[in-house]
Amino acid sequence: MIDKKRNIEINERLRNLYKKYQKEYLSMYIQRFKDPDPPQRINEFGIIDAERYDTDNGILFIAKETHGWSNEDYSKGIFFRSWLKDMTEHGLHGHASWHPLMWYNLGRWASLLNNPSQDISKLAEIKSISEIGTLAFTNINKVRGESSSGSAYQNLAHADITGCLLRKEIDIIQPMTIVCCGTYQEFIRHVDFNGKVIEMPHPGARIKTKVMLNKLSEQLKQYDSNS
């Protein structure tokens, strides 16, 4: 069931969580990334569209990090959650247009999760950007990353504060399904989760669209057969 009020409350609790851990997390980020001009805060994640997220059957995607998130973006109040909602409503622009295939894949995965019986060959031809609006979303790195996820990301991903924040996000969102988008090892390092855990590659990986969709479909079928 979609409960807009509940979804808004979840996002507000997440916003307060990020404020509470902001100083500690930024300190660790600066230590790991050696960022000479870090932002004054961390990013905001959570339920993308409060009017579309089914809280009782919720799906949380966990990705690695954002690239190119400038201090100006932060100072203007441009945060990941609201930016992603805008993208689902108005299409790719800005940061998202740099790697469109990644967002198309995320949309297709969301679509398949919401309707597992659909034809994969047809889905592979659809961009499905709007389907991302049915998800909750977070990143392992809550600030920003480099052009590729290297040792700085790994060091931050392994930090205790990263695991602490991730567990608290999951506790607030209470998803039924978690999809690890190239983050499965980071996830199992920090989290013990009783729901469905789907292991997927990075959505921008050089893997054929249908291969990734079949990987997702097979995992969903495996969960169904075990239920």
Stretch-by-stretch model annotation:
Residues I2-E12, I140-S227:
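Glycine/proline-rich loop-helix segments at beta-alpha junctions forming the active-site rim
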Residues I2-I173:
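A polyanion-binding, active-site-adjacent surface
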